[in-house]
């Protein structure tokens, strides 16, 4: 779980934070940092196209949580919770890596694209849909929040 902490400090705290201080569009900055996050997992066991896409989408989701709060606590918490639920609680592989003993034991009838196969939940179509929906919700919330703060008159 310390890996999640290190990844968030590096990917969101440093890389996305620096990109947001350039003239680059915030969504392009978010995409670039998410792509680097996905590439960070390039040599994980059992990586294929769908898990790589989901890692990119997860990078967008977690990155958006930083983009709209500018607080590392939110993305770190999301990432830790995500990994903790998958591995130590449900017994899934986390990004292709086995966590060993878990609180619950999943008995999947077969490994396929619905359950993520050997890569774990992050290799599933369900994860793809979940990451897209969560990213849209974070961006919607963040844009709405920014619009409200811009509409409020500034005091002298």
For the regions a language model picked out, list residue spans one by one.
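Hydrophobic alpha-helical transmembrane segments
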Residues: 2, 111-132
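Histidine-centered divalent metal-coordination motifs
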Residues: 12, 41, 79, 83
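Membrane-interface helix caps and helix-loop-helix hairpins in membrane proteins
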Residues: 40-49
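Membrane-embedded alpha-helical segments of multi-pass transporters/permeases
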Residues: 42, 87-91, 136-140
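Membrane-interface capping segments at transmembrane-helix boundaries
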Residues: 137-152
């Amino acid at each position: 779980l310390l890996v999640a902490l290190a990844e968030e400090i590096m990917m969101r705290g440093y890389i996305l934070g620096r990109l947001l201080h350039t003239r680059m569009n915030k969504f392009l900055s978010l995409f670039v940092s998410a792509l680097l996050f996905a590439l960070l997992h390039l040599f994980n066991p059992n990586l294929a196209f769908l898990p790589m896409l989901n890692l990119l989408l997860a990078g967008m989701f977690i990155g958006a949580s930083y983009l709209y709060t500018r607080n590392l606590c939110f993305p770190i918490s999301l990432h830790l919770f995500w990994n903790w639920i998958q591995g130590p609680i449900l017994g899934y592989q986390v990004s292709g890596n086995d966590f060993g003993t878990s609180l619950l034991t999943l008995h999947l009838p077969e490994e396929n694209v619905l359950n993520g196969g050997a890569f774990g939940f992050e290799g599933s179509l369900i994860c793809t849909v979940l990451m897209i929906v969560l990213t849209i919700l974070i961006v919607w919330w963040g844009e709405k929040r920014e619009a409200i703060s811009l509409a409020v008159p500034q005091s002298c």
